[in-house]
């Protein structure tokens, strides 16, 4: 198509390159400023993304578990204690924070996964509260005050790396024998079982994976905010994770990440937008935050991530019409 | 005998849905299971596939008792089924439904996929190819990517048969596979069932369409109120006084 035409960029390459260079360096500078300003927001978005994926793990086989705040607490405390009392490398500490709740998920899951729907949700809320109250009453970890002054060992690098590894895992699960089995269980567990799928084993595996990811997020957060206390792992926290996943959409592992990023950034966006158009800080912004959340749930029941698919479908339809 | 039921009973509260049923299904047969509404036919299929446990008696598949095994173990021993009230995975595409049915045949692991091994992709493509072949066999290849919930009733029934065949089962339990189909679809499904049996799958067919049952089954068992009231080749069943009485009511 372009075979006969001379290439204009090659003749006047120097000035063009120069201009691009200039704009690029400005962009990089902007990017650096942006990162420095919003470092903590990005870090929290990453941690929340991990938490959203931890809920997605159980949702992907149709199970509503609210135990992940408890698993997160175990990961956070285990890793924080290791950092404070034994100066182990950070990677080992993170691994311990990931494995500890996963080990606990197996004995929890065996009895609890016999329950369905809202009964499973209630039983797992119970587990979360037991863990939280356990830490409240454990003198070794300073009870309700928790551990403070944990060295800051987690940064954007480790958080985003953990997120990338976890996302990779969930993406690679799709289409495998196991991934197809999880979809089948989510859609109709009894039918899946008569197709030879051991639903209990799959559900247990996903509860354990979710616990591991929640524990990893807890370990990262403990070393990002310098502290752990039982107040950070309440029932409300478990619901937050669920909201991230549902608002983002659970059809694809990117959905929970979109939801977590959106809901973590929303208060910041509202603050920036609010001060520029004169909305005063305070309850009004909280109200807007809630209203946007409600709007997403009402008008995008399959989550924010479904916008992309809708757009794609409309383009296909227009393409056919044309 | 491939599948043997020996005095199998199942009661729900005081109702004897299945009451001391004994019959056997020969290897390679198309075995019909008929009876008036509420005779216990679907309950029997649920018992064989392990969705419910019998309250008495035994079920033996290829010499092995299966009546206390969980459904996925029974499936692994070679039993696949369809449902009277269609239980496709509604949000998945037709082809994804069939691929899910291949669970027992697939050997790929998550680890292969995580390590980006070419074998993982190859296995997934093989699974997809097999599913396409099965959809072609039930005449639905062009509907492969359609959501199961959007398919017509007859199409859903055919996808369900393809999904059951995906496991390459020794015994295929079909629960009213032609319900709600027009005559052309019925005869197509009849041909499909005959073809499936000729390829070595044993079929246990619950069906209300007596004409179809009479034309393709070699043996027929008739249930009424949870009990076996007659058994034999189609010609004998058609003239059996007990069967006529059960369907039309006894002469006063």
Task: Describe the function of each predicted region.
Chain A
Residues 12-15, 262:
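Local alpha-helix boundary/kink/capping signal
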Residues 6-7, 18:
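Short, low-complexity intrinsically disordered segments enriched in A/P/G/S/L with frequent Arg
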């Amino acid at each position: 198509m372009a075979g006969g035409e001379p290439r204009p960029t090659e003749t006047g390459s120097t000035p063009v390159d120069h201009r691009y260079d200039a704009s690029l360096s400005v962009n990089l500078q902007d990017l650096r400023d942006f990162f420095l300003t919003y470092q903590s927001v990005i870090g929290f978005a990453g941690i929340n993304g991990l938490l959203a994926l931890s809920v997605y793990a159980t949702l992907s086989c149709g199970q509503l578990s609210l135990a992940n705040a408890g698993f997160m607490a175990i990961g956070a405390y285990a890793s924080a204690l290791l950092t404070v009392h034994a100066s182990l490398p950070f990677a080992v500490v993170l691994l311990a924070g990931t494995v500890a709740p996963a080990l606990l998920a197996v004995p929890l899951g065996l009895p609890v996964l016999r329950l369905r729907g809202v009964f499973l949700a209630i039983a797992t809320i119970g587990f979360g509260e037991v863990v939280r109250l356990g830490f409240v009453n454990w003198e070794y970890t300073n009870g309700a005050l928790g551990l403070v002054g944990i060295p800051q060992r987690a940064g954007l690098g480790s958080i985003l790396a953990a997120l990338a590894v976890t996302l990779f895992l969930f993406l690679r699960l799709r289409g495998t024998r196991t991934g197809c089995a999880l979809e089948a269980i989510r859609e109709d567990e009894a039918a899946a079982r008569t197709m030879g799928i051991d639903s209990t084993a799959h559900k247990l595996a996903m509860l354990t994976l979710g616990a591991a990811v929640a524990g990893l997020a807890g370990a990262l957060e403990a070393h990002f905010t310098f502290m752990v206390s039982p107040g950070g792992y309440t029932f409300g926290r478990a619901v937050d994770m669920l909201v991230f996943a549902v608002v983002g959409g659970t059809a694809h592992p990117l959905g929970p990440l979109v939801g977590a990023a959106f809901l973590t950034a929303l208060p910041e966006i509202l603050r920036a937008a609010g001060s520029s158009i004169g909305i005063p800080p305070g309850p009004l912004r909280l109200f807007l935050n809630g209203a946007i959340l409600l709007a997403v749930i009402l008008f995008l029941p399959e989550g924010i991530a479904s916008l992309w698919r809708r757009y794609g479908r409309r383009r296909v339809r227009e393409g056919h019409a044309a | 005998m491939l599948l043997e039921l020996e005095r199998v009973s199942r009661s729900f509260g005081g109702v004897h849905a299945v009451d001391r049923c004994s019959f056997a299904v020969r290897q390679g047969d198309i075995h019909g299971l008929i009876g008036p509404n509420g005779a216990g036919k679907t309950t029997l299929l649920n018992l064989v596939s392990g969705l419910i446990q019998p309250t008495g008696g035994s079920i033996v598949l290829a010499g092995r008792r299966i009546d206390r095994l969980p459904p996925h173990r029974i499936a692994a021993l070679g039993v696949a089924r369809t449902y009277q009230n269609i239980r496709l995975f509604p949000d998945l595409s037709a082809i994804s439904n069939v691929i899910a049915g291949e669970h027992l045949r697939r050997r790929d692991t998550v680890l292969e996929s995580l390590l980006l091994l070419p074998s993982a992709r190859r296995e997934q493509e093989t699974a997809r190819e097999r599913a396409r072949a099965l959809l072609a066999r039930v005449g639905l290849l062009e509907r492969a990517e359609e959501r199961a919930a959007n398919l017509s009733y007859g199409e859903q029934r055919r996808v369900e048969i393809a999904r059951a065949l995906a496991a390459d089962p020794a015994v295929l339990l079909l629960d009213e596979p032609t319900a709600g189909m027009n005559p052309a679809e019925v005869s197509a499904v009849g041909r499909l069932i005959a073809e499936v049996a000729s390829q070595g799958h044993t079929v246990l067919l619950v069906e209300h369409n007596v004409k179809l049952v009479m034309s393709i089954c070699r043996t027929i068992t008739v249930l009424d109120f949870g009990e076996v009231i007659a058994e034999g080749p189609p010609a004998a069943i058609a003239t059996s006084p007990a069967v006529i009485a059960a369907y039309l009511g006894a002469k006063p």
